[in-house]
């Protein structure tokens, strides 16, 4: 996934990954929180946003979405994969009005306009063999 994250960040694509962080790549599988896998993605140019409790998970999810649309910087929103997901806590649910207040509709429309579509073809983020690259460089 990390190579794809470089491509997403390089194209300035508004993206949010919501990650329930657990220890997977260490010596033994553990259900308890370990952010080493998330920290392995620091060099991908994704912004990292950590939540500490269920209320923050919901609030920061909306904040991350609004921020990525505004800045066109991809985000990883992560939280403890066991403790936070199993914690019983009263939260104040976000309403649709809260979401509409945070998310600018014009930014959503602009994001959708940048989508790849056969009606408006555009070339972005290509991968080429050395011979094709040289032909392209020589033609400029």
Residue ranges and their predicted role:
Residues 1-40, 46-69:
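Thiamine diphosphate
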Residues 38-42, 89-92:
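Metal-ion/cofactor- or nucleotide/acyl-coenzyme-handling active-site neighborhoods
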Residues 75-139:
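Conformationally flexible catalytic loops at phosphate/diphosphate-handling active centers
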């Amino acid at each position: 996934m990390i190579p794809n994250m470089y491509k997403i960040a390089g194209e300035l694509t508004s993206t949010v990954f919501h990650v329930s962080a657990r220890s997977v790549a260490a010596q033994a599988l553990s259900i308890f929180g370990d952010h080493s896998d998330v920290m392995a993605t620091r060099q991908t140019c994704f912004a990292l946003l950590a939540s500490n409790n269920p209320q923050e998970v919901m609030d920061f999810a909306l904040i991350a979405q609004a921020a990525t649309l505004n800045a066109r910087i991809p985000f990883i929103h992560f939280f403890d994969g066991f403790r936070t997901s199993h914690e019983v806590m009263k939260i104040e649910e976000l309403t649709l009005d809260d979401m509409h207040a945070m998310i600018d509709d014009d930014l959503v429309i602009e994001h959708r306009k940048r989508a790849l579509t056969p009606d408006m073809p555009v070339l972005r983020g290509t991968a080429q063999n050395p011979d094709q690259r040289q032909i392209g460089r020589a033609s400029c």
